[in-house]
Amino acid sequence: MSERDRNGGRSADNNRNDRNERGGRNDRGGRNDRRNNQQDERNQYIERVVTINRVSKVVKGGRRFSFTALVIVGDGQGMVGVGYGKAKEVPAAIQKGAEEARKNFFRVPMINGTITHPVQGEAAAGVVMLRPAAPGTGVIAGGAARPVLECAGVQDILCKSLGSPNAINVVHATVAGLKELVRPEEVAARRGKSLEEVAPAAMLRARAAGQGA
C-alpha cells in the first residue's frame, strides 16, 4: 500500500471522528428515540374518526379538493378531546384532527364509571341528553355520541340525541354536556355544606364502592 493510500485512510477516519464529535450522524439515534417516544405517547390514547368529508373549492383553473376529519382522542380514564383537521389527503387530515384533539383535552367528572348527574348539552342545532346509569348498563348511546363517551372512559350512561342528527353537532353537543358536569365536592363547597348534605345516598355508596375497588 502506498503512502498516499495510508494518508487517505487516516484522513477518512479523522473525518468520521470529527463528524461523530460534532454530533452529525450519531444524532440519528437521538431522533429515532424521540420518534419512538412520540409514537408511544400516541399509542396510549384511544382515537376515533367520526366523519370524513370531502370539500371542493372552485378556482380559476378548476376545482381543488381537500378533506376534513372529525377526530376524538381520549385516554379512557376521564380525559377526552375533539379536533377538526383539514388537509389535501385523508391521513394528513386525520393526523391534524388528532393533534388538535389532544390540545383540547378536558377532564370528565365520573363516579364508579358513570357521570355525576344528569345534564343536557347544546351546540348549534345539536341537543344531547346525558343521564347516569347503574353499573352493568353499558353505554346506551348511538351515532356520534358513543365515540366521545367511549374515549372518555364512561362505562355506564344513558344518552339520547334530541336535536340535529348531524355528526358534528352531536359531537359538540355531547362535549358541551360533559363540560357542564361538576363533582359533588364542588357543589358542596359552593353551597357551604357537607358532602353528605348535597350528594344523594346512592351516589355516596357508588363513590365509596369505587374507592374501595
From Swiss-Prot:
PROSITE patterns hit by this protein: RIBOSOMAL_S5, S5_DSRBD
Give me the ranges of the annotated region Disordered.
1-42
The question of whether Ribosomal protein is a record keyword is answered with yes
- The segment(s) forming the S5 DRBM domain are 45-108
Extract the SUPFAM superfamilies matched here: dsRNA-binding domain-like (SSF54768), Ribosomal protein S5 domain 2-like (SSF54211)
**Domain of life from the UniProt record:** Bacteria
Query: Any idea which UniProt keywords this protein has?
Result: Ribonucleoprotein, Ribosomal protein, RNA-binding, rRNA-binding
Question: Which GO terms fall under biological process for this protein?
Answer: translation
Q: Which GO terms describe its molecular function?
A: rRNA binding; structural constituent of ribosome
The record, for Gene3D superfamilies, names:
3.30.160.20, 3.30.230.10
Database matches in InterPro entries: Ribosomal_Su5_D2-typ_SF, Ribosomal_uS5, Ribosomal_uS5_bac-type, Ribosomal_uS5_C, Ribosomal_uS5_N, Ribosomal_uS5_N_CS, Ribsml_uS5_D2-typ_fold_subgr
Question: Which Pfam families does the entry link to?
Answer: Ribosomal_S5, Ribosomal_S5_C
Q: Name one GO cellular component term.
A: small ribosomal subunit
Q: Does the keyword Ribosomal protein apply?
A: yes
Task: Say which family it is in.
Answer: Belongs to the universal ribosomal protein uS5 family.
What is recorded about the protein's domains?
A: The N-terminal domain interacts with the head of the 30S subunit; the C-terminal domain interacts with the body and contacts protein S4. The interaction surface between S4 and S5 is involved in control of translational fidelity.
Describe its assembly: Part of the 30S ribosomal subunit. Contacts proteins S4 and S8.
Record function comment: With S4 and S12 plays an important role in translational accuracy. Located at the back of the 30S subunit body where it stabilizes the conformation of the head with respect to the body.
Q: What is this protein called?
A: Small ribosomal subunit protein uS5
Q: Which organism is it from?
A: Corynebacterium urealyticum (strain ATCC 43042 / DSM 7109)
Gene behind this protein: rpsE
